[in-house]
Amino acid sequence: MTRLVSKLAVALALAASSAAAADVTLLNVSYDPTRELWRDINDHFIPQYKKTKGDNLAIKQSHGGSSTQARAVIDGLDADVVTLASVIDTDAIAQKGLITGDWVKRLPSSSLPYYSTIVFVVRKGNPKGIKDWPDLAKPGVEIVTPNPKTSGNGYLSFFAAWGSVITRGGSKKDAVAYVTKLYSQVPVLDSGARGATTTFVQKEIGDVHLAWENEAHLEVREAKGDLDLVYPPVSIRAEPHVALVDANVDRKKTRAAAEAYLKYLYTDEAQEIIAKHFYRPINDAVLKKNAATFPAGIKLFSVKEIAADFAAAHKELIGTGGVFDTIYKPKR
C-alpha cells in the first residue's frame, strides 16, 4: 500500500504539469478510493478527445470522504463533474442549485456507470473466523471502518450492517442492538476509505476492514498473502452516480468536454477498465465476461429494502440525532 501511495504522488505531479498546457481542464471530484480507476479512465479518454475534438484536455482529480467532498463543492471547490459514493451526496449539491434537478435522468442507467458493495478484508488465514456480519459482534473482534458522517464507505458500511439484520428478518430493535455492539468494537473512525485502509494495512490495527469491493481487492493484492478477502452472504448494493456540476461547467464553458467525459464511461472500453479496477460494470455483457472477478454468491440488497429511499435511510440511520448518534461512543 506504501507503493500505491508513491504511485499516486507521481501521477498527481504529472497531472499538474499536463494541465498547464491544456486547452480545456476538467476537475473530477470523487470519493476516496477511486484514484486508480479515474487515472486509468483519464489516460484512455484524453487521447480520444484530442483526436476527435482537436483540443488538449487535462483532467484533474480530487479525492476524499464522499460527504466531505460534496460539502467542498458546495463551499466552492470548482468541480466540473462529481463522481461521488451515492445519490445522497450528489443531491446535497443539487439542493444548493449547482446541479439541475433532472441530473439522474441525463445518462444511461440513472447516471450509474458501475456499482459496488461492501466486503470484508481479514488477516492471513482469517484467525477470528469472520464469515458473516454476526461474526463482527463477537467479543474480541476489532473492526476498521470509516466515519459514516464523512465517508461513503462509512455510511454504506453502516447501512450494510443494519441491512444484514433487517433483510434477514430481524427487527429494528435487533438492528440497533447489533450496530451498538459492532461500533463499540471500532477503535478509530477515519474520515475516508483510504485512511481506513492505512489504519488497517500499515498501522495493523483491527481484525477486519469493512471496505469497498475494489479497495479490498487492492489491499489483498498489495499485501502479497498477508490479507484475505471475505465475501459475506449479504451486503448492500452501492451505487456511485455521476453528474455534471451545471453551474460550474456553464461558467467555465466546459460543458461539452464534461458531457463527453461522462458519456465515455458507458463505452465498452471504459466498462472494461471499470471491471479491471474491481468495480461492477453496468453493462451486463462486460459484467458476465468478468464474472470470475465478482462472486455471484453474495446477495446485494437495495437501500430501499431498509428505508423508503436513500434520503430516508440517511436521516434515520446517520443523520443528526439518528441511530448512529445514539449508539456510538468515541474511544477516549
Cite the ranges covered by each PLM segment:
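Bacterial N-terminal signal peptides that target proteins for export
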Residues: M1-A9
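N-terminal segment of the mature folded domain
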Residues: A22-S151, Y328-K329
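Short beta-strand->loop
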Residues: V29-Y31, V122-K124, E142-R168, L182-V186, ...
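Extracellular/periplasmic juxtamembrane helices and adjacent flexible linkers that interface
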Residues: V249-R332
